[in-house]
Amino acid sequence: AGVSPERRPTHVEDAMTALDPALAEHLDATKDARLESYLEFLRIPSISALPERAGDIRRAAEWIAAELARIGFEHAEVSETPWLPIVYADWLHAEGAPTVIVYCHYDVQPVDPIELWTTAPFDPFVRDGRVIGRGAADDKGQLHMHLRAAEALFATRGRLPVNLRIVFEG
């Protein structure tokens, strides 16, 4: 019934790939591309609290919608709201399977006071196996993880195991 403690994977990726060798191969082959994509996303200064960053908010939304469409989601679109754009996408072809809704936000908080930063907030980098940059932990990292997980499933299985609706807001 479960995995014994001495055989328990120490990392989520290890747990997933132990069950699916094709997924493990895909994740290994795309590791560098996934990291570069993540860093590219983090470079967008999508600060929602600053009206002068409205163009960056829009650019982040369009970047996400383009990624969703590229990896196989249908109806990937940016919808205007009175405040900030919402990105919506879906894939609804897992007949009989549940529908899962994934929500994240792609905006970040202002960086002021900038003089307290020891690194440039929108020039992300990897240090000691960790990605450092504004939004890496809240919430661009989680959002990007959802994109890459779906991409890996589309690439290795040609489909998702559930119906999936995506809602990302700025």
Name every feature range the model reports, one short phrase each.
Residues 8-11, 54, 116, 142-144:
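N-terminal low-complexity, intrinsically disordered patches enriched in charged
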Residues 81, 167-170:
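Short loop/turn motifs enriched for small/polar and acidic residues
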Residues 2-15:
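Short, Lys/Arg-enriched N-terminal segments with co-localized hydrophobic residues
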Residues 11-12, 38, 138, 152:
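General helical structural elements
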Residues 3-4, 30, 39, 130:
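General helical secondary-structure elements
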Residues 17-114:
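N-terminal helical capping/dimerization or prosegment-like subdomains
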Residues 97-168:
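Active-site metal-coordination/substrate-binding segment of hydrolases
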